[in-house]
Amino acid sequence: MFCYQCEQTAKGEGCTISGVCGKKPETAALQDLLVYSLIGLSEVAVEARLYGVVGHEYDEFTVKALFTTLTNVNFDDASLAEYINRAVVLREQLKYRLKAAGGRAEFTDAPATFKPAADLNGMIEQGRNVGLKSDVFAADENIRSLQHITLFGIKGVAAYADHAMILGQEDKKVFEFIYDGLAAMRNSKLGLNDWVGLALKCGEINIRAMELLDAGNTGTYGHPTITRVPLGAKKGKAILISGHDLKDLEMLLKQTEGKGINIYTHGEMLPAHAYPELKKYPHFYGHYGTAWQNQINEFAAFPGPIVMTTNCIQKPRDSYLGSIYTMGSVSWPGAVHIKNDNYDQVIKKALEMPGFTEDKPGKEILVGFGRNTVLSVAPAVIDAVKNKQLRHFFLVAGCDGAKPGRSYYTEFVEKVPQDCVVLTLACGKFRFFDKDMGAIGGIPRLLDVGQCNDAYSAVKIAMALADAFKVGVNDLPLSMILSWYEQKAAAILLSLLYLGIKDIRLGPSLPAFITPAVLDVLVKNFNIMPITTPEQDLKAILG
């Protein structure tokens, strides 16, 4: 096995024995084989698109299949085998359609012709030969590095496209790029500059995917408004829902109405409390726990069932394996998988389990500082900057993880001067989300913009402020201090680079899949840099 797509990869180089995420070598091989099969499907789809025969079922399958290969999504070998077989069936169907439409009948490249083994062990063996270090990708290490950057970015795009599609938002251009990008992995004529261009194109398309998801979320549930969310618990039966998918949450709220069950969010579902069409449910109570990497202890202590809607799932303890449920692309062997948004089993389990036997007091936090909320007070923000009440904005955002070095982000926020504002989004916020940082002229100094996909909202805020001050985004009193963990973060980083945003500080470590030569290109063109210490970075930024 060889996998280095996440920040916590072993020794900062790559997982070769077992995944730090809990992924077994057999699962890694099947994920590699699934990507390989999707490359083959994409090669046919690129050609078939010219004849107008790529139906929606191919688009939908491709994004869902790619989503299953993200870190901490699908650990179920049988499920991955089903995806592989389905990819090949669809590929052959598409060849037939292409031929019937007058297109070419034969494809000779290996991914477009491969046949899955008849059994799981055979597939695993096939997967071991088509991984990230195989000749599926370029021999040149720098081109291969850019191929992998693009591949991981495409996985992030696919995740956002899947979320958006569930809410009825899609754009053919997103699907077309996914096919083009995957098929390009087999184009030996592409050089270093071509791959830099493709990586940045991935960033451009990811902006569109996030825009679609934003339209789906706000169009369905309203724009987020400032909302207080309790971190304590209310006496009564309880269900915990984690992940990102707001529609899954909505369906759970509808099906639990009047049943005496309180619904709690976990992880990246926290911002859901700010959406008007969700917070109208009286039994949508509060937030439980912190970021994904703490779930093993937090889930074990939760007195009700847990629903995982999207990444990030870790190996469940035996103590709660019988009360954790997966949905959509998420799967774990032994955990019940919910289909068609039917929560009957979850509700039954919640009524059987004890729930909270007494009220548990806790702090309250504020959420709901999406672009509409922040831009509604833009005049006050602009005045505060002009009057030198507000010196600087920091976007401290991104993924959380288990590495000790991530304490940097807590310390950074704690050391930010009193005349500065911190915007945050994604699960990295759980390092400091419950801190009372006060306000500047009525504007809270800590603003939760939302989920990781709400990077779109943060970009819109930055662009609006740049317009108001009549400067470029890079000339704003704004610094980006980002943490990354998985492939959605890779896609967001590519989006920021596509927009020309410079001086990004990235941590806690740089991606293992970026070679020194590729890093040099990023430094020269975008001045991207690793984090150092909070004190040094603040001094460098503020002087």
Curated annotation (Swiss-Prot):
It is found in: Cytoplasm. Its main location: cytoplasm. It holds the Pfam family Prismane. Keywords: 4Fe-4S, Cytoplasm, Iron, Iron-sulfur, Metal-binding, Oxidoreductase. InterPro entries: HCP/CODH, Hydroxylam_reduct, Prismane-like_a/b-sand, Prismane-like_sf, Prismane_a-bundle. Binds 1 [4Fe-4S] cluster. Binds 1 hybrid [4Fe-2O-2S] cluster. Hybrid [4Fe-2O-2S] cluster binds at residues 244, 268, 312, 399, 427, 452, 486, 488. Its EC number is 1.7.99.1. Belongs to the HCP family. This is Hydroxylamine reductase. It comes from Methanocella arvoryzae (strain DSM 22066 / NBRC 105507 / MRE50). The gene is hcp.
